[in-house]
Amino acid sequence: MEINIIRGQNQIGGSIIEVSSKNTKIILDVGSNLDDKEIVVPEIEGLFKGEAKYDGVLISHYHSDHEGLATKILPEIPIYMGEKSYEIHKITREYIKKEYLKEPRVFKSEEQVSIGDIKITPYLCDHSAFDSHMFLLECEGKKILYTGDFRSNGRKFFQSLLDKLPKVDALITEGTNLSNDKIGKINLTEKELEKRGIELLKGNDRPVFVLMAGTNIDRIVTFYKIANTTKRLFLLDTYAGQITATIGGNIPNPRTFFNVRI
């Protein structure tokens, strides 16, 4: 297999990475640039214009710097995305009245899919975007791991993911926050943030307002736990309410949780 970093090597986000074998070409993520005020579609032949030359595009998660150009891909090229990640992508795009993907091929964690002669296994990973995945690519006796975006301070146990991953021949990753400790920036875990929030709000009956991304599900869970422990009603805006109601399950949402409202 060959790896070609089309974009993203010298910047944060905006990732477009090509992996090819003798018979197959795939793309890992199609992010828009964070600094672009308007979507700028790069002139990539066979992906965004001309005759399609790629066999598939894999989207690791719904943040725009990794999927912002997904709707600009040539329609003949299949797009693969996590099921819940796609649902959040669709809700977000509808909410801001932007075009969304109509029929991507959804995958589930650790269920292998094949694109041509490349086998891909998605692995659920911890990130501020719900349903984020790493991709293990196998072909021609080689293994490549593409991490997408990940962290180790959320609510998922990072070591259990590491234990599942095999040894690989190549690792593709971003390193945008590797040096935080050196510059004195402290990254609290979600559980540490929960503990600090409870300490601050206990014995305080005034309203509390939190500014955060409505798609950061781990953070919503953290502040729900803070509200629940300090006996407060948990209020979400309409966007976050729609996101959490769609995800459902154990995620605090206005549809099934009695103390969550919009």
What do these predicted regions represent?
Residues M1-L58, S64-D218, T222-K225, T229, ...:
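His/Asp/Glu-rich metal-coordinating catalytic cores
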Residues T238-I262:
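A contiguous, basic/glycine-rich beta-loop/short-helix subdomain that forms a polymer-engagement track
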